[in-house]
């Protein structure tokens, strides 16, 4: 796996953040790691990005390229090297040998313990910086305006990246038109989304689900 110095993980964060002291509501097993493990975070983010990569690029091999199947010239007595098909990669217009295919797998293996260490490190950083708000942001109906009003109550509507861990469908539909709000189910939280977040909003029930995930 690459060293952490070989890549920079850029994220624009908001200055002068509103602080929330939620340490009393946070379990120590998830949010009280004293020293963040940056190499584990780096490796996990690389793996998360690689797993999203799709092998959509492709070229035609000799079986797929158009052309005759006739033997170009007879086997012997021409002085030329023997050839069996014009679609061979050695001819102009022939198929590509060893080209990119849609079957390529870009996934990078990261050990489970390293993933867990990275996830807890990211959560602990948010807790230490007082960037976690324990609150049930459930919505009775789909309304972006009501959600914005709720964010204004906590004076967090101007933050660049608000991460909400919730499974509420009304909340998801209300937040999808807000560029600075990202709503993710607890079992889909990634290390990269936690690192980029200015604020994590999570309910006590979702914290329990988070403990089960770890």
UniProtKB/Swiss-Prot annotation:
Keywords: Ribonucleoprotein, Ribosomal protein, RNA-binding, rRNA-binding. Pfam families: Ribosomal_L4. Coiled coil: none annotated. GO terms for biological process: translation. GO terms for cellular component: ribonucleoprotein complex; ribosome. Residues 71-85 have a biased composition (Basic residues). Residues 56-86 are annotated as: Disordered. PANTHER family: 50S RIBOSOMAL PROTEIN L4 (PTHR10746), LARGE RIBOSOMAL SUBUNIT PROTEIN UL4M (PTHR10746:SF6). This is Large ribosomal subunit protein uL4.
